[in-house]
């Protein structure tokens, strides 16, 4: 097998005797230098329940790689806990961590001349960070998702971490007492695994399964169930076979694969963050992809799955109902999926789905029949207008009326908005504007889960709108529009909004407009001055200087 291995540059020849000496110290024997050397990029951490189980999965992958004839080399990648950093300055590092993860995996794999990589991730940015690196590296690779958390339970209701965020708003509005608040807090996260609804982590793992970079059924498994470890071992076996056959990510991460991922994300009601991350992965894979592609697919694909945050069920329920393969098969038979797209197994999507039923089982309610979808078209709408000439992303599930025109309540940070919500200062009909939270302005494009959850908890979810140049958590729902571009920091129109200005959000018409005359906007633009950078040293300063627009994926390597 050694003939086509790039690790030969490290393991072969007299001049590489010192290199082999060091490899012997980490477990290589005389016969091992002809084997493929495979990295296991492991995001294990006790920082977050999302990554708590990854160490055991890495050990299982290591054993399976050895059994398959490869030499595994484990290395760590960082993680940020979005849930724990939410609503704080620390959340500015979340999207930054996507780039750090990508850079670190690329650095190790190329620095060590590895022949392949098995990446294991849990929390939100682990997934796109790993896939960006895989696309850049273009060496045989497979992604293993650490698995989803099981739901908590209180008063006969399933709980997720978003339940705790919403409880803060309910408590502040006097709708629940402190005892209930504390009980929800205690029960929301009962063990290891990523946040349980169709939030960002589960959305991206589902996307990777649809793209063929993860094994079927693996994206909805519970972190603590034995099948997750078994799937990890099988992923390692498949990776060794991919190395032997030289199945490269560039053959898998094609335009068809991205279109398949977008279709599945629409069908499952996935996170707005998928738009940002798929744009970034496509950039690394050199695949043309734009916001308009999401809108084109959205118009054709219904929402089939009744999943939290706006629905009833969690990812483990989806798994029991047939998982992502069931959703994919429903799309495939209706011509909404590319069946000839390649997967990491060497099979096509159609071949992988051959034995999956064409329709969902009748004994479950998670996946709707095709003729009774939750929504007739996709939920992630791309809005444009004078407030977002480059585009913005709206999630239009879970709202009774997807249009609003109201007076602007303007905040230059998430914290000041949160104070107003908890103080009862937001009124029905208001359109909240949170700005200077974009990729450059934040920097880091924080997720606005705390204010959106507080709005829901206060009973205002159907009565107010919220727009921001920041992001939203996968746990967000309501009349919310994020990723507004150009962002305020670079002089986007959102920077020119004044308190009391009328703003229209019209999701069905895909419009977002500031109802101010062109002359007045030009007067304000002439008077506007860019703010000083919030950071002049460290990683946030570097990120702010290099990151591009959210409409392009907020990538940091778009130098040409």
From Swiss-Prot:
Catalytic activity from the UniProt record: (2R)-2,3-dihydroxy-3-methylbutanoate = 3-methyl-2-oxobutanoate + H2O; (2R,3R)-2,3-dihydroxy-3-methylpentanoate = (S)-3-methyl-2-oxopentanoate + H2O
Metabolic or biological pathway: Amino-acid biosynthesis; L-isoleucine biosynthesis; L-isoleucine from 2-oxobutanoate: step 3/4; Amino-acid biosynthesis; L-valine biosynthesis; L-valine from pyruvate: step 3/4
Protein family: Belongs to the IlvD/Edd family.
TM helices/strands, residue ranges: none
Keywords annotated in UniProt: 2Fe-2S, Amino-acid biosynthesis, Branched-chain amino acid biosynthesis, Iron, Iron-sulfur, Lyase, Magnesium, Metal-binding
Organism whose genome encodes this protein: Gloeobacter violaceus (strain ATCC 29082 / PCC 7421)
Modification N6-carboxylysine, positions: 125
PROSITE patterns: ILVD_EDD_1, ILVD_EDD_2
Name under which the protein is recorded: Dihydroxy-acid dehydratase
SUPFAM superfamilies in the record: IlvD/EDD N-terminal domain-like, LeuD/IlvD-like
Physiological role: Functions in the biosynthesis of branched-chain amino acids. Catalyzes the dehydration of (2R,3R)-2,3-dihydroxy-3-methylpentanoate (2,3-dihydroxy-3-methylvalerate) into 2-oxo-3-methylpentanoate (2-oxo-3-methylvalerate) and of (2R)-2,3-dihydroxy-3-methylbutanoate (2,3-dihydroxyisovalerate) into 2-oxo-3-methylbutanoate (2-oxoisovalerate), the penultimate precursor to L-isoleucine and L-valine, respectively.
EC number(s) per entry: 4.2.1.9
Residues at the active site: 473 (proton acceptor)
Any single biological process term in GO: L-valine biosynthetic process
Note on how the cofactor is bound: Binds 1 [2Fe-2S] cluster per subunit. This cluster acts as a Lewis acid cofactor.
Oligomeric form and interacting partners: Homodimer.
Any one GO molecular-function label of the UniProt entry: magnesium ion binding
Residue numbers binding [2Fe-2S] cluster: 50, 123, 195
Cofactor: [2Fe-2S] cluster; Mg(2+)
InterPro entries: DHAD_IlvD/Edd, Dihydro-acid_dehy_C, DihydroxyA_deHydtase, DiOHA_6PGluconate_deHydtase_CS, ILV_EDD_C, ILV_EDD_N, IlvD/EDD_N
Residues binding Mg(2+), per UniProt: 82, 124-125, 447
């Amino acid at each position: 097998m050694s003939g086509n291995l790039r690790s030969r540059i490290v393991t072969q020849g007299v001049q590489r005797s010192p290199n082999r000496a060091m490899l012997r110290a980490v477990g290589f024997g005389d016969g091992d230098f002809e084997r493929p050397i495979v990295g296991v990029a492991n995001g294990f951490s006790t920082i977050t329940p999302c990554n708590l189980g990854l160490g055991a999965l890495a050990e299982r992958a290591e054993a399976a790689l050895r059994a398959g004839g490869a030499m595994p080399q484990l290395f760590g990648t960082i993680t940020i806990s979005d849930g724990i950093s939410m609503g704080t300055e620390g959340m500015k590092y979340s999207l930054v961590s996507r780039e750090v993860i990508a850079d670190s995996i690329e650095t190790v794999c190329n620095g060590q001349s590895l022949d392949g990589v098995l990446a294991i991730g849990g929390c939100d940015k682990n997934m796109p960070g790993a896939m960006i690196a895989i696309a850049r590296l273009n060496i045989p690779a497979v992604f293993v998702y650490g698995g989803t958390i099981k739901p908590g339970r209180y008063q006969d209701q399933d709980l997720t971490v978003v339940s705790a965020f919403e409880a803060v708003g309910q408590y502040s509005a006097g709708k629940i007492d402190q005892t209930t608040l504390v009980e929800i807090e205690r029960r929301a996260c009962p063990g290891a695994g990523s946040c349980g609804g169709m939030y960002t982590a589960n959305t991206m793992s589902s996307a990777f399964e649809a793209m063929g970079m993860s094994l079927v059924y693996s994206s909805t498994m519970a972190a603590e169930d034995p099948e997750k470890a078994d799937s990890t071992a099988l992923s390692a076996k498949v990776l060794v076979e991919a190395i032997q056959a030289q199945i490269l990510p560039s053959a898998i991460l094609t335009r068809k694969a991205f279109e398949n991922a977008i279709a599945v994300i629409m069908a499952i009601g996935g996170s707005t963050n998928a738009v940002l991350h798929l744009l970034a992965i496509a950039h690394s894979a050199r695949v043309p992809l734009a916001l308009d592609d999401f809108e084109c697919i959205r118009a054709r694909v219904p929402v089939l799955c009744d999943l939290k945050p706006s629905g009833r069920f969690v990812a483990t329920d989806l798994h029991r109902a047939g998982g992502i393969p069931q959703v994919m098969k429903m799309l495939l038979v209706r011509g909404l999926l590319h069946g000839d797209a390649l997967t990491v197994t060497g099979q096509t999507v159609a071949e992988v789905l051959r034995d999956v039923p064409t329709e969902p089982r009748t004994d479950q309610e998670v996946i709707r029949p095709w003729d009774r979808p939750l929504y007739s078209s996709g939920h992630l709408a791309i809005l444009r207008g004078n407030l977002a000439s480059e585009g913005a992303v709206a999630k239009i599930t879970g709202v009774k009326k997807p249009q609003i025109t109201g007076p602007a309540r303007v905040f230059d940070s998430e914290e000041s908005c949160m104070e107003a919500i908890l103080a009862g200062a937001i009124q029905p009909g208001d359109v909240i504007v949170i700005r200077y939270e974009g990729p450059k302005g934040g920097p880091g494009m924080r997720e606005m889960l705390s204010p959106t959850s507080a709005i829901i908890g206060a009973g205002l979810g159907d009565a107010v709108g919220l727009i921001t140049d920041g992001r939203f958590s996968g746990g967000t729902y309501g009349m919310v529009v994020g990723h507004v571009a150009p962002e305020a920091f670079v002089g986007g129109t959102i920077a020119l909004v004044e308190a009391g200005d009328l703003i229209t959000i019209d999701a069905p018409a895909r419009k977002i407009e500031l109802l101010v005359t062109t002359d007045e906007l030009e007067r304000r633009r002439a008077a506007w001055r860019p703010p000083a950078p919030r950071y002049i040293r460290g990683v946030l300063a570097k990120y702010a200087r290099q990151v591009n627009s959210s409409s392009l994926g907020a990538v940091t390597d778009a130098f040409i």
